[in-house]
Amino acid sequence: MLYSIDNIAPDCNQANFIAPNATVIGNVQLEQDVSIWFNVVIRGDNDPIKIGAGSNVQDGSILHTDIGAPLTIGKMVTVGHKVMLHGCSISDHCLIGINST
């Protein structure tokens, strides 16, 4: 599901796959060939979230921001199952392991 918040809608036009029960909210930009898997929540309500080309966010992960703390994921990144990312930057070609916080 895609939701706008404060009249800002997610930019997911280039994404390769968004699971039907994933939730993408607000100021979120998904670059080319990004995949968002089942039960993922990406909440760009306070600051922007950008996910780089070829990256994937796996089942049950939660990505969100805080005021002054945007979230940026580089290119070709794998965010493993049930990962919690809050207002951080991940470089290109990284693997964030299962259950990481």
Predicted regions and their residues:
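Extreme N-terminal tail/first-helix region
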Residues: M1-N16
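A structural detector for short beta-strand units
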Residues: P10, D47-I49, A69-L71
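Left-handed beta-helix
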Residues: Q14, A19-P20, I25-G26, E31-Q32, ...
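Conserved protein-kinase catalytic-loop segment immediately C-terminal to the catalytic Asp
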Residues: T101
